[in-house]
């Protein structure tokens, strides 16, 4: 089931959903005119190789309008997740790391997520506190920084980017409970909302004023360039392994093999899951001029991939290389 299937009609779509039995089915509602959809098709093709037990389906949203309307798909890309012919999750927008996360989560689960009545909900105020403190600067907006879904959100993202502010965001269109609850929690009725260190700064107009006065510049951390970020990551620990998955669970055969070798050396090392961050995944290939994963670094310098690690192990040099003796 490694290939991405295509549903060209409502009947074909229904048949694919019904035939998938208890396995996970991920449907990408896409459009050929949207470049972000083409990019996400490539991500799906990669995921199909990594998750052969999952069925991946492409459906051109405008070509099969009855299915798009049934599931209230109004923009592309949109991803729907099905099990036992029932929709269990939805993801709007081109968010490769989040798509990867959700596929992994649902693929590893053999049952449906708990229904709202079967388990107590996390206290909403507690959840909102966690969200507004999720990063030093948090923007609650419609859409994502890559794909804002209203003019005000687009303007505030442009302002923050112009000021090189490092911020994280939350798409309030993806969670109605957060969307309504945050209005009351912060006594602020509109979006976007910008928070610094868990405190509400305000909306677009206030952020504009703070940019003009220079206050925002003093208040918010500056975003690193990708090169600066990659340099910091490869130097995060003396020995850094960039892989698919983590120490507890490798998500490809090559990563699994290199973990076994590393664990047998007794040398302390840290890992970074490249499936969690598409920017790092692609950027590190160019940064180190090394096109594949896993990649192993010692003191910020690339050692190589699995084949080189195997060679170093066979020659008896691996431990001394990992300890920085060579």
From Swiss-Prot:
Q: Where is the Glutaredoxin domain?
A: 125-227, 227-326
Q: Which GO terms describe its molecular function?
A: iron-sulfur cluster binding; metal ion binding
Q: Iron-sulfur as a keyword?
A: yes
Identify the PROSITE patterns for this entry.
GLUTAREDOXIN_2, THIOREDOXIN_2
**One cellular component (GO) term of this entry:** cytosol
**Positions annotated to bind [2Fe-2S] cluster:** 150, 252
What does the UniProt entry say about where the protein is found? Cytoplasm, Cytosol
Q: Which GO terms describe its biological process?
A: [2Fe-2S] cluster assembly
Tell me the superkingdom of the source: Eukaryota
Q: By its UniProt entry, which PANTHER family does this protein fall under?
A: GLUTAREDOXIN FAMILY MEMBER, GLUTAREDOXIN-3
Oligomeric form and interacting partners: Homodimer; the homodimer is independent of 2Fe-2S clusters. Heterotrimer; forms a heterotrimeric complex composed by two bola2 molecules and one glrx3 molecule; linked by [2Fe-2S] clusters.
Q: What does this protein do?
A: Together with bola2, acts as a cytosolic iron-sulfur (Fe-S) cluster assembly factor that facilitates [2Fe-2S] cluster insertion into a subset of cytosolic proteins. Required for hemoglobin maturation. Does not possess any thyoredoxin activity since it lacks the conserved motif that is essential for catalytic activity.
Let me see what the UniProt entry remarks about domains. Answer: The thioredoxin domain lacks the two redox-active cysteines. This strongly suggests that it lacks thioredoxin activity.
Specify the protein name: Glutaredoxin-3
Which source organism? Xenopus tropicalis (Western clawed frog)
What gene is behind this protein? glrx3
